[in-house]
């Protein structure tokens, strides 16, 4: 495995789930990690798991607030004066996902939490990477970012399609600065966001899903790829296809 020693990575949504797993995996490859999320407690827990090497730095922020995102950027500038990797992972969903239940407030929550915050993070990361003529952006979208379905809800789907478009647009414009962008589209992953599903997901079903550590390993692999390559888009799903099997049962 290629070493990431000397690299600085900023991981958002780092307190749980995919973000936590990505932070641990990239740290294991030697990178210094800046952990960001809304809640300091989970971030501190993640930091304690990697801080024997002194490589974790906790910077809580509400990524829907541009000034708080800029403050994290200022911390990175003052502490390291470089940023090599952004894992743009923070995201949210809600229980009431159907059009007849949506409100202006819930629409704002979904768009700001899944798309606006990610855009803010990119605008903070790019100046570092342009200066360095090198940098990698990895964005967690969802299968909902490429395919239309009823499970994730329409506004979440809109936001994740935006993440996909953002990443491909970054590769078009920023390649001249040595910057690469990957959009990661996982299927069902056993993370706390499942608790927001309208119908509860039991432990047996969760055990068959993609696990956060699987995502962390993939993100580390992307982070260690040679600079002359870019993985534009990558899908990862469980081999147990719950959607197909549920449809089959309904047909029977």
Predicted region positions:
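Active-site helix of classical SDR
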Residues: 122, 159
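The beta1-alpha1 cofactor-binding region of Rossmann-like NAD(H)/NADP(H)-dependent oxidoreductases
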Residues: 41, 60-71, 104
């Amino acid at each position: 495995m290629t070493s990431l020693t000397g690299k600085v990575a900023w991981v958002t949504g780092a307190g749980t789930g995919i973000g936590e797993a990505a932070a641990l995996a990239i740290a294991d490859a030697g990178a210094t990690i800046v952990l960001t999320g809304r809640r300091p407690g989970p971030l501190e827990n993640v930091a304690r798991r990697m801080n024997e090497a002194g490589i974790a730095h906790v910077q809580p922020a509400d990524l829907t607030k541009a000034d708080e995102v800029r403050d994290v950027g200022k911390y990175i500038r003052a502490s390291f004066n470089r940023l090599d990797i952004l894992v743009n992972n923070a995201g949210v969903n809600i229980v009431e996902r159907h059009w007849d239940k949506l409100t202006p407030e819930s629409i704002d929550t979904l768009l700001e939490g899944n798309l606006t915050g990610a855009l803010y993070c990119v605008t903070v990361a790019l100046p570092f990477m342009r200066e360095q003529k090198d940098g990698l952006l990895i964005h967690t979208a969802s299968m909902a970012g490429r395919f239309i379905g009823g499970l994730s809800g329409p506004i979440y789907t809109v936001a994740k399609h935006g993440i996909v478009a953002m990443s491909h647009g970054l590769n078009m414009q920023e390649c001249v600065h040595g910057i690469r962008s990957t959009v990661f589209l996982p299927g069902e992953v056993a993370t706390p966001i499942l608790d927001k599903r309208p119908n509860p997901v039991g432990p047996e079903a969760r055990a068959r899903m993609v696990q956060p550590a699987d995502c962390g390993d993939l993100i580390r692999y992307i982070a260690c790829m040679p600079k002359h390559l870019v993985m534009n888009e990558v899908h990862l799903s469980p081999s147990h296809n719950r959607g197909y099997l549920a449809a089959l049962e309904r047909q029977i």
